[in-house]
A protein has these predicted regions:
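Carrier-protein-dependent adenylate-forming modules in NRPS/ANL systems
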Residues: 1-189
């Protein structure tokens, strides 16, 4: 049995490079999603980053708006490694909020706009989320949940001359958390 190794692929065989690709340690860096966004904004600031319908957002604008969101969330106490719920309709604002949450070092927990409030609350409590970002239209539905709620509209209106910077972010922190319906009917993350 000592010579039998069924659990590890044969990386030394030529066919292994076709299946797994060559090992390239120079590509493994300690970057996080926010670092990649910022690098793209510096490299190609006017390049289109997001398109939704007729709306186009450049990397510069995405980075600027994400900085606004991150600054507001950091000032509100959001820290690296924490989880923030994200309950918005699909669109540019949803993606800007994802980038902003990533810039805090926290993870986002996406919840579809049609998610019932009871299910949303179960997921956020189970994930130990520090709060939820939604839009003004959905905010009234969260009034009696006891959750900390931020709205995208308010987060995007905040103005910071010097963005509040994250610290203590590690590639080991989660970037996002997903919940499924679960076979028991209880959401599982």
């Amino acid at each position: 049995m000592n010579n039998l190794n069924l659990l590890q692929p044969y990386r030394n065989e030529p066919s292994a490079n076709v299946i797994y690709g060559p090992i390239q340690p120079q590509l493994l860096r300690e970057e996080v999603l926010a670092d990649l966004l910022e690098a793209s904004a510096q490299r190609d600031p006017e390049h289109v980053a997001l398109i939704f319908g007729e709306r186009h957002v450049s990397y510069r604008e995405l980075d600027r708006q994400a900085d606004q969101v991150a600054s507001a969330l950091i000032e509100a106490g959001v820290r690296p490694g924490q989880i923030v719920g994200l309950w918005l309709p699909r669109g540019i604002e949803l993606l800007v909020m994802q980038a902003g949450i990533a810039k805090t070092g926290a993870a986002w927990l996406p919840l579809d706009q049609d998610t019932p409030v009871e299910r949303l609350q179960i997921c956020l409590e189970d994930a130990d989320a520090v709060g939820v970002v939604c839009c003004e239209t959905l905010r009234p539905l969260l009034a009696h949940t006891g959750l900390t709620v931020w709205t995208a509209e308010v987060l995007l209106m905040q103005s910071y001359t010097a963005p509040v910077r994250r610290s203590g972010v590690s590639p080991d922190h989660p970037a996002y958390v997903i919940y499924t319906s679960g076979s028991t009917g209880k959401p599982k993350g």
